[in-house]
Amino acid sequence: MKRTFQPSTLKRARVHGFRARMATKNGRQVLSRRRAKGRKRLTV
C-alpha cells in the first residue's frame, strides 16, 4: 500500500493558496478569521 501523502507544490497552492481563498466568499472569511487571530501565515 502506497503512502497517501505525495506532496506537490502546485496542487497545494491551487487548493489552499491565497488566490484560491480569495476566489470564494467563504475563502475570504477564512482569510479574515486568520488575520483577526493574528496568524503569521494566512495561506500556504
Swiss-Prot record:
Cellular component GO terms held in the UniProt record? ribonucleoprotein complex; ribosome
Q: Which GO terms describe its biological process?
A: translation
Q: Where is this region: Disordered?
A: 24-44
Name the InterPro entries on file.
Ribosomal_bL34, Ribosomal_bL34_CS
Biased composition, Basic residues: where in the chain?
A: 31-44
- Family matches, as Pfam families: Ribosomal_L34 (PF00468)
Please provide the record's keywords in A-Z order: Ribonucleoprotein, Ribosomal protein
The UniProt record lists the keyword Disulfide bond: no
GO molecular function annotation: structural constituent of ribosome
Q: Which PANTHER family match?
A: LARGE RIBOSOMAL SUBUNIT PROTEIN BL34M (PTHR14503:SF4), MITOCHONDRIAL RIBOSOMAL PROTEIN 34 FAMILY MEMBER (PTHR14503)
Alphabetical list of NCBIfam families matching this protein: rpmH_bact
What is the similarity comment for this entry?
Belongs to the bacterial ribosomal protein bL34 family.
**Name of the protein this chain belongs to:** Large ribosomal subunit protein bL34
Q: Which organism is it from?
A: Pseudomonas aeruginosa (strain ATCC 15692 / DSM 22644 / CIP 104116 / JCM 14847 / LMG 12228 / 1C / PRS 101 / PAO1)
